[in-house]
Amino acid sequence: MPRTVLALGLASALGFGALASPGFANAEDRPLTAIGDVQRGTMVMVAGTVDRMLDEDEFRLRDETGTLRVYVGPNWVPVDVGEAVTVFGYMDDALIRPELYAREITRADGTVVTLSQRYE
């Protein structure tokens, strides 16, 4: 048990927050959440279609249960409108305009885009 805690702490300290969460060691272990069921303040994985670009670093994702703002900054949006994607990241806890802070985007062709810069 102490080794697990040490490893998780080290992963977190090195900026691998997604890897620091038990149960999220790889993409296959991450449960898919419907956009309408996303809870604030949690790590989530959602899938949908890019509905529209909101800014150079933000887009709206849509599934059959709703829409969600996805923030990729300070990176450029690496997807296109109409593209089916899966996004893993942190859902902030803002009451007004909550956003999913993307850490990883998987495109329909299987390409994984890891967003290496953290958010400010």
Task: Please tell me what each predicted stretch does.
Residues 1-9:
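Bacterial N-terminal signal peptides that target proteins for export
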Residues 4, 15-120:
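OB-fold and OB-like single-stranded nucleic-acid-recognition modules
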